[in-house]
Regions:
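Ordered alpha/beta subdomains of enzyme catalytic regions
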Residues: 2-4, 13-325, 338, 350-352, ...
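Short beta-strand/loop segments at the ligand-binding rim of alpha/beta enzyme cores
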Residues: 139, 378-406, 424
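Glycine-rich beta-to-alpha transition loops that act as phosphate-gripper elements at the mouths
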Residues: 147, 209-211, 403-411, 430-432
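Catalytic beta/alpha-barrel core
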Residues: 161, 329-334, 358-367, 402-406, ...
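Short, surface-exposed connector motifs at secondary-structure boundaries
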Residues: 323-328, 353-359, 394-401
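Catalytic cores of alpha/beta
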Residues: 339, 409-423
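Conserved structured catalytic cores and adjacent interaction surfaces
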Residues: 347, 361, 368-374, 378, ...
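Glycine-rich phosphate-binding active-site loops on the catalytic face of alpha/beta enzymes
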Residues: 423-442
Length: 601
């Protein structure tokens, strides 16, 4: 399925143009609105992401607010999560761009209103709620602050902060969580795979067929790319987002060939009889390797191969004729070492003989560590033997051949391969990546933190579920070596931290955990990204921060900044998330004010 060919200049150009077209359409063709500095955005990529994509109780709550004339009172909500996924200590935030598109286009269509009126829960509801309120509702009074997409984030820190009329802000909850939860989970999963595989390996996403539905497949391709994957097999995702697309053939292609007559057209470049040349090459390869007395290989049986599967050779020739400059063969249909690799080498050498450059092989089953090492060793010996026979085109075969491995690869498999040793250049990863099999949900929540400018707190027997009240400022403080030290939350009107000035950082709930930090750099995390009153998304924020390639680059840069102990798989060190001294005192006082004292008898 996957081809590890390096992306051509044409592909890169197409990807860049595709991304630019997408961003221009997102900005409504780049036209300025009447405020000049704010943008009206295009709809979400998935046309199901509308105002109606919500839970019924959001409608009933909005009705109750409206019925009690509370719907226009100003409320603030935080989108946050409480625990990092996959047993790790970091998360990649994604989904902001789609959230802003959703806000930009939030309204109930006439047919949406008519449908809601027919719902069972609407029987007791005043029709004026639908005709006068829901029919006119939009995000023109909403303000959204968000962290830049692709940022490494941590529990409790708000990813998105929504302020506006209570009725509208409540109606945004379900869809915002839908757009952020899965996107952040997949991007985090992809980033973890990239960390485990290392920077040199190519990571190829091909989970479309295993994804949870059509949108699950397209979204997974998009956010896996943001998280650090190099390409996808998903053509629709490639078209939508300009992601490089790779692909070769499946086992069925090999099985579909049985006779040389199946190949219609045998000419490749200056080679008039490619199939005949490939058969002769296989014959010479067998003779050269079996008669070699100076083999450096410890696996003599590997080099002394017998008859290979002819139908497999036929299929390889057919594919090489179709794609002489990007030939990558799946070699495990019958027997990887006894048939697949000898057949591949014969066809690859024939291509090289006539001036073409084949790409490599893919292994989709078996012991990937052992097989990759044996495949590489076979090519080294084949190259040496053919060079001794005066064939200069064999030189470089082993070095330039890319070995791609697939077969239910996940983080654990990648670590085991690294420990045992392998010769794999690229990994095709599907099921475990797109389904997030290790953890199927991130668990973002949407919590009311302020009502009519008065902070609100949600209490729980589980201290992890206690919210940090009020509208907050959020900052990341960096040390002298450039690494982030702590994320700190402040009350809305507190003085911002400054470089070189000590900041008291306190654990939100444990009194004894506190420290002074003197930052060498201060980064503001929550930025205004939607200003409904002024007409939309701030142009400066959009142009500097939004876009697939910007988010992808941000992930790479941010992960490199983090201390390695925060990123490691085994017993990672939790990153510090703190509150200011003022916010700590306020939170705990509000906690006491809202917690009834027990009566003891």
């Amino acid at each position: 399925m996957i081809d590890t060919t390096t992306t051509t200049t044409t592909t890169k150009a197409f990807g860049a143009k595709s991304e630019e077209r997408r961003r221009r359409s997102t900005c409504g063709g780049g036209e300025k609105n009447h405020h000049h500095h704010f943008l009206k955005l295009s709809p979400c990529v998935n046309n199901l992401a509308t105002a109606l994509l919500t839970d019924a109780y959001q409608i009933t709550m909005a009705y109750a607010y409206w019925k009690n004339n509370k719907h226009e009172r100003i409320a603030s909500f935080d989108v946050l999560f409480r625990k990092n996924p996959f047993g790790g200590e970091f998360t990649i935030f994604c989904g902001l761009e789609e959230s802003l598109k959703f806000a930009s286009n939030f309204r109930f269509a006439k047919e949406d209103i008519e449908y809601l009126k027919r719902c069972e829960f609407a029987k007791e509801m005043d029709p004026r709620f639908f005709d006068e309120y829901l029919a006119a509702v939009d995000c023109s009074q909403i303000t959204i602050e968000g962290i830049k997409e692709g940022t490494v984030v941590f529990p409790r820190v708000p990813l998105v902060h929504v302020t506006g009329p209570l009725g509208v802000a409540q109606l945004l909850e379900t869809t915002l969580l839908t757009l952020i939860n899965y996107a952040s989970l997949v991007a985090t999963n992809a980033a973890r795979h990239r960390l485990t595989a290392g920077d040199e390996a190519q990571l190829l996403e091909f989970g479309l067929r295993r994804a949870q539905g059509v949108d699950g497949g397209v979204s997974a391709s998009r956010y896996a790319y943001v998280g650090g994957f190099d390409a996808t097999s998903n053509c629709e995702a490639g078209r939508q987002f300009g992601i490089p697309v790779r692909g070769t053939h499946a086992h069925s292609f090999v099985q579909a060939h049985s006779k040389w007559e199946d190949i219609d057209g045998n000419k490749v470049g200056e080679c008039e009889d490619f199939c005949g040349e490939a058969r002769e090459m296989l014959k010479e390869l067998r003779e050269a390797m079996s008669s070699d007395k100076n083999s450096g290989s410890k696996n003599h049986g590997l080099c002394h191969f017998g008859e290979t599967n002819e139908s497999e050779l036929i299929s390889f020739c057919a594919y090489a004729i179709a794609f002489p400059n990007s030939f990558l063969a799946l070699i495990d249909t019958y027997d990887t070492l006894k048939s697949g690799i000898p057949n591949y080498v014969a066809v690859a050498l024939t291509l090289r003989k006539f001036g073409f450059q084949p790409v490599g092989v893919r292994i989709d089953s078996g012991d990937l560590s052992y097989l990759s090492l044996m495949v590489r060793e076979f090519m080294v010996e084949a190259e040496r033997c053919l060079e001794l026979r005066g064939h200069p085109f064999a030189k470089g075969l082993a070095q330039k051949t890319k070995i791609t491995a697939s077969n239910d690869i996940n983080e654990t498999v990648l670590r085991e391969l690294k420990q045992s040793g392998h010769s794999i250049d690229a990994f095709g990863i599907g099921t475990h990546l797109v389904t997030c099999l290790a953890q199927p949900a991130l668990g973002c929540v949407y919590k009311l933190v302020e009502m009519d400018k008065k902070p609100r707190i949600k209490l729980s027997e589980d201290v992890e579920k206690v919210t940090i009240p009020g509208k907050k400022q959020c900052f990341r403080l960096y040390g002298k070596n450039g690494e982030p030290i702590v994320d700190v939350m402040l009350r809305e009107n507190e003085k911002e931290p400054k470089v070189g000035e000590r900041v008291l950082c306190r654990h939100p709930f444990i009194e004894s955990k506190r420290a002074f930090v003197t930052p060498a750099k201060v980064e503001k995390l929550l930025l205004v990204c939607w200003d409904g009153k002024n007409g939309g998304c701030p142009r400066e924020f959009y142009e500097e921060s939004v876009g697939l390639e910007k988010s992808r680059l941000r992930v790479r840069e941010q992960v490199k900044l983090m201390r390695t102990d925060h990123l490691r798989h085994t017993n990672p060190t939790p990153y510090k998330v703190s509150v200011s001294g003022d916010l700590y005192e306020f939170t705990h006082q509000l906690w006491l004010d809202n917690l009834p004292a027990r009566e003891l008898t």
